[in-house]
From Swiss-Prot:
This is Holliday junction branch migration complex subunit RuvA. Homotetramer. Forms an RuvA(8)-RuvB(12)-Holliday junction (HJ) complex. HJ DNA is sandwiched between 2 RuvA tetramers; dsDNA enters through RuvA and exits via RuvB. An RuvB hexamer assembles on each DNA strand where it exits the tetramer. Each RuvB hexamer is contacted by two RuvA subunits (via domain III) on 2 adjacent RuvB subunits; this complex drives branch migration. In the full resolvosome a probable DNA-RuvA(4)-RuvB(12)-RuvC(2) complex forms which resolves the HJ. Residues 64-142 are annotated as: Domain II. Residues 143-147 are annotated as: Flexible linker. Has three domains with a flexible linker between the domains II and III and assumes an 'L' shape. Domain III is highly mobile and contacts RuvB. Belongs to the RuvA family. GO terms for cellular component: cytoplasm; Holliday junction helicase complex; Holliday junction resolvase complex. Residues 148-198 are annotated as: Domain III. It is found in: Cytoplasm. The gene is ruvA. Residues 1-63 are annotated as: Domain I. Gene3D superfamilies: 5' to 3' exonuclease, C-terminal subdomain, DNA helicase RuvA subunit, C-terminal domain, Nucleic acid-binding proteins. HAMAP family: DNA_HJ_migration_RuvA.
Length: 198
């Protein structure tokens, strides 16, 4: 079992990043790959959780130990697998998640991808009071210059599709941001806030 990896970030896709360490490239599933954009070809430390299946050994990575802790608590809930947990963690500010769990806000929890009423209730039952304090904002928030807004928006939409959001929902998101110019990370962050509001 791995705790973290330190190596050079060599590749970013809509679903995962690749970190090279000791001559090996590790494919790591992360909540928001584009939040690592500023770290390409640089040394990074990624906190890890390994999932072993019959057909695959999967690595899930996180910017911080707080982010990893949220993920681990989520996958302890019946009905929530690693992919769903990662989609939930993708919402940068997890304070809302913690507050919803502690206050039994089922409707809020059901706005997360693939979370129905039964699973939301189970989240409250299993996790209420388990978070000592709201975790810090997850992911990197450094802004970078953007000269190709539409390209960045395309990347953001692709990442949101990978997180489980439907094309119909994202069509409205694209229209909302079409005339703006942001980084993919900023688009994802803003889009998630709108999607959570319904």
């Amino acid at each position: 079992m791995y705790d973290y990896i330190k190596g050079q970030l060599t590749k970013i896709t809509a679903k995962y990043i690749v970190v090279e360490a000791n001559g090996l490239g590790y494919m790591i599933n992360v909540a928001n790959p584009y939040s690592f954009t500023d770290s390409v070809n640089q040394l990074v430390t990624i906190y890890l959780h390994q999932v072993i299946r019959e057909d695959a050994h999967l690595l899930f990575g996180f910017h911080t130990e707080d982010e990893k802790d949220v993920f681990l608590k989520l996958i302890s809930v019946s009905g929530i697998g690693p992919t769903t947990a990662l989609a939930i963690v993708a919402v940068d500010d997890n304070e809302g998640l913690v507050n919803a769990i502690d206050n039994s806000d089922i409707k809020y929890l059901m706005k997360f991808p693939k979370i129905g009423k039964k699973t939301a209730q189970q989240m409250v039952l299993d996790l209420a009071g388990k978070f000592v304090e709201a975790p810090q904002e997850t992911g990197h928030t450094k802004a970078r210059s953007n000269k190709a807004g539409n390209t960045q928006l395309d990347e953001a939409i692709e990442a949101l599709l990978a997180l489980g959001y439907k094309a119909k929902e994202l069509k409205k998101i694209r229209a909302f941001f079409e005339e703006t110019s942001e980084t993919a990370e900023q688009y994802i962050k803003s889009a998630l806030k709108l999607l959570m509001k319904g």
